[in-house]
Amino acid sequence: MGDILIAIKMKSIIKYLFVLVLSLSVIPLYAQHNKAERQVVHHKIINKNLEGDLVNQSHGRAIVALCYDNQEQTCQSLLLNALKKSFIEQGISFFVLKDKLSGRNTFQLTTEAEETIKLLRDSASCWHLNPYDIGVMGFGVGGYVAAMVSCKAPFAERPNFSLLFNPVISGIDLKRNGLLADITLPSKDAVLSVDESGFVASFVRRHLTPEAALFLTNDDVVVNPLQNGVAYYTAMRGNGNNCSLFIYPKGGHDFGLLADDVCRKQLIDDVNSWLENRQLIATPQSIRVACIGNSITDGAGIDLASEKGYPAVLQKRLGKGFAVRNFGVSARTLLRRGDLPYVNELAWRDALAFNPNIVVLKLGTNDSKPENWRFNDGFERDLLAMVDTLQALPAHPKVYLATPIPAFKPTWNINDSVIANAIMPIIRKVARKRHCKIIDLHTKYAPYGELMQADGIHPTAEGAAKMAEIIAEDLSECDVKK
């Protein structure tokens, strides 16, 4: 009898353990299912060409995929399906812009992509998106459009990052894909020589073209990686812009998507890893800081100025609550009648569109050249005009006027006497008139001549860090904490 009771109890225990194990195995699946249900709010059809999956409890990142009905259509669909699930799991809202190629020109394609990015930014508050974290991605010809939008779109329609998969960059492959209609080749002074191998890459702009991740296959016989993706990476790296390059030994133009091979799996892992590790700088709550200036702001002579120039170091010093942007352009003057006026530059238009809360305006070094200073009667007027334009922005920024650092050598006819005795008094006068604060770099940087490059005009990376230190200390506490 005792043996029977023991057997019955053992069966009960085994049954209980079986149920327990089964329930434990179901819990993770149930939890994952609930997580997916919580993440996706709904699938939204925005118009006949645009639809998206909006993610609840998202960090605000969104990606727009550009898809076209050409010979790559099957590969595009496979790539989107492979990435869509992982994007949603990361809390990324995902949009797809579908369009036809027949009868279209590239201007129409880029315009529609720009309008889509602007739509997402305009709808950011109601769709719970971060307007400063909108990316664009494209495969093949879609990569061409994504790259062009990244390089040439106005600030409000330009993405914050791009994902380019075996992108068409060269004119040669554009012709092969029948897309060269209505395209004007870039001028001969572009970043790359104007042969057809570097067509889109020649439009890359220092500090202004957003960071990119390029995914290429070495055995792509449809789009030659050297003339296309590698050319774009070379232009980005040559301009000191942030860019990542992934090259797979095999996979073909479709990355093995059609065969479901190892390249496809590695590609998905690399895309997810890049997105997870991408540093987010700006949010709608960030204090936006615009650094406006010439080559000293730009970081001329400093390799990877996007990381080592003074604006980048200033970003690190100020911290996460700030979004510091470099709008420096080499050789530019404050004088509108100078040889290269800053106000004619895309960087000036971008700085205004950035709508900063704080501006560090540092111009005047190139104005001291005799060929420019002969127009000195316009310096005060032109500086007042710049300050007035900045202060009239919707954010009503606090404008700091930084004096030029000393010219330790008279390289390129730059005259430190003119800077100290003529330009700086005008800067101080304008500061009093417009209630701006002065950052006296000329005085405070004077002891650091050893932190200059051989030309005596441009700081080294260490000198740029010292500039950032001086500027950070001079930003008033109320401006830093507002």
Regions found by a protein language model. Give the residues of each.
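Active-site segments of SGNH/GDSL-like serine hydrolases
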Residues: K362-N366, T389-N421
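The feature captures the conserved acid-bearing segment of alpha/beta-hydrolase catalytic domains
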Residues: F161, I169-R176, V191-V230
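Catalytic His-Asp segment of secreted/periplasmic serine-dependent ester chemistry enzymes
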Residues: G252-L258, I302, I405-K482
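N-terminal cap/lid segment of alpha/beta-hydrolase-fold proteins
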Residues: Q32-G60
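C-terminal catalytic histidine-bearing segment of alpha/beta-hydrolase fold enzymes
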Residues: D53, V230-A282, A454-D455, A461, ...
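Primarily recognizes the serine-hydrolase "nucleophile elbow" in alpha/beta-hydrolase
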Residues: E115-L179, E196
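Conserved SGNH/GDSL esterase-like catalytic core that processes O-acyl groups on lipids
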Residues: S286-A290, I296-L384, V418-N421
